[in-house]
Regions:
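Acidic/histidine-rich catalytic neighborhood of metal-dependent amide-processing enzymes
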Residues: 117-190
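Active-site metal-coordination/substrate-binding segment of hydrolases
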Residues: 75-142, 436
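N-terminal helical capping/dimerization or prosegment-like subdomains
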Residues: 1-92, 316, 333
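An extended, acidic, His-containing surface patch that forms the Zn2+-binding/catalytic region
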Residues: 48, 181-182, 239-316, 327-340, ...
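Acidic, glycine-rich active-site loops and adjacent beta-strand->loop/helix elements
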Residues: 84-86, 144-153, 175-179, 203-205, ...
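Polar, glycine-rich mid-to-C-terminal structural blocks
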Residues: 204-207, 211, 216-268
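Flexible glycine/proline-rich, aromatic-decorated loop/lid segments
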Residues: 186-202, 411-413
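A generic structural motif
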Residues: 115, 205-207, 323-330, 360
């Protein structure tokens, strides 16, 4: 694969850049034509790589790309999942180059989607291409590439149910996560789920003069802050009744395996420019961000936030809250429990609403599975060191849906790094990670 990469490197850049130049931002209506254009370009790349068939399939939202190459029904089938939609680029003024005009500098590609997830799904197309052209492919390979991952995949689960037979496979292979570091590879054997809600606290029927009414009328922002502060106690435990009922404690053996991941607390604090860490008592930082649930306020607003001063007592206050969940916690159940709890602590002098948004369940895969062992062997060969099994703190809710619908496990071979700043300005992807990913994926097919 190394020789194939070196020989075709310039073509690879040209093809990947053709994807990165398409502003496939799924959350913005004005980019709907770009979503279709990106899907059609992926079909071209799959067919050129050696797929027997590939097509764009409509959904209730943005389209899905499906392609496949069937060698022999008796052989194992790998279903490659990826997403071609990207995050918005705001704030655009912080980018050092045009987010949709990819540049190579300092050994990395800079563009929106360079890592998440166009760069990583492109690795799969090229590894597949290599295996087909070199005659080494001994698997049936299917691709399912969606355009709604960044907005919670609202259409894919229903589409997958309707096309379950077409998607039948033995494993879901995914590259949409990070490694521990450039020198320490890891295989993600689980991810957290998500419950996302918006809360609204309403007081008086209009904004009031704080001099005339302050001290006599409840301020919705003050009330909201009090309610939010009560959601987590001094030990970092979430106070929502029933929140932890389905959380399964990890065994000492599993905690020991996860602790193999190198972690320097002082480096961590320096990187974030913070003096101390804070979280749930009794757990390490890696455990808090991987195997334990958490609750965070993602945004809070109300009243006057413009330039200068305006002394109002606001009528309404809002907040958006995410809860990261661990496997065995049900997203819909947690959303219901949160709603019941938040309404129960609301004082009677304000009106409180909870508006559920998207969510999804977490998942785990056994590290004893043949697919995990094949990935472990492949990454060891590429990096010269055995990968560490890790648990992702983020969420890809659709993977739990696909796991349930198709009755197969996902395997996450991610090659991104924290330095890639996905979802932020100046997203990038190291060339050596791009090429190492191609090598490792090709080796996965050899060993699986």
């Amino acid at each position: 694969m190394k020789t194939y990469i070196e020989t075709n490197k310039e073509r690879f850049f040209e093809e990947l850049f053709s994807l990165l130049r398409i502003p496939s931002v799924s959350s913005l209506e004005q980019h709907k034509p770009d979503m279709q254009r990106c899907a059609e370009r992926l079909v071209e790349l799959l067919l050129e790589a050696g797929a027997d068939e590939a097509a764009v399939y409509p959904t209730t939202g943005h389209p899905v790309v499906f392609g496949q190459k069937l060698i022999d029904p008796s052989l194992p089938t790998v279903l490659v999942y990826g997403h071609y939609d990207v995050q918005p680029v705001d704030p655009i003024e912080l980018w050092h180059s045009d987010p949709f005009e990819p540049e190579i500098r300092d050994g990395a590609i800079y563009a929106r989607g360079a890592n998440d997830d166009k760069g990583q799904l492109f690795m799969h197309i090229k590894a597949f291409e290599f295996m087909v052209r070199e005659g080494g492919l001994k698997h049936n390979v299917k691709f399912i590439l969606e355009g709604e991952e960044e907005i919670g995949s609202p259409s894919l689960a229903a589409w997958a149910k309707e096309n379950k037979d077409m998607l039948a496979a033995d494993i879901i292979l995914v590259s949409d996560t990070t490694m521990i570091s450039e020198s320490v590879p890891s295989i993600n054997c689980g991810m957290r789920g998500l419950s996302y809600v918006e809360v609204k606290v309403t007081g008086p029927n209009k904004d009031l003069h704080s001099g005339h009414y302050g001290g006599a009328v409840a301020n919705p922002i003050n009330v909201l802050c009090d309610m939010i502060s009560s959601l987590i106690d001094k030990d970092g435990h979430i106070t929502v009744k029933g929140f932890y009922d389905d959380v399964v404690e990890l065994s000492d053996e599993d905690r020991a395996k996860l602790s193999r991941a190198p972690f320097d607390l002082e480096e961590y604090k320096e990187f974030l420019d913070i003096k101390e860490i804070k979280g749930e008592a009794g757990y390490s930082t890696l455990e808090r961000t991987g195997i334990r649930p958490c609750l965070d306020v993602n945004g809070i607003w109300g009243g006057y936030t413009g330039e200068g001063a305006k002394t109002v007592l606001p009528s309404v206050a809002h907040a958006k809250i995410s809860m990261r969940l661990v496997p065995n916690q049900d997203s819909e159940t947690i959303t219901r429990l949160f709603t019941e709890h938040f309404l129960s602590i609301a004082p009677d002098y304000v009106k409180v609403e909870v508006i559920p948004h998207h969510g999804g369940d977490g998942f785990l895969i056994p590290i004893s599975s043949p697919a995990y062992k094949a990935a472990e062997k492949a990454m060891t060969e590429v990096y010269g060191i055995e990968p560490v099994p890790s648990r992702g703190g983020g969420s890809i809710p659709i993977l739990a849906d696909l796991q349930r619908i198709l009755e197969i496990d996902p395997l996450l071979m991610g090659f991104g790094l924290e330095r890639d700043t996905i979802h932020s300005p100046n997203e990038s992807y190291l060339l050596k990670q791009l090429f190492a990913g191609m090598e490792a994926i090709a080796l996965f097919y050899r060993y699986y």
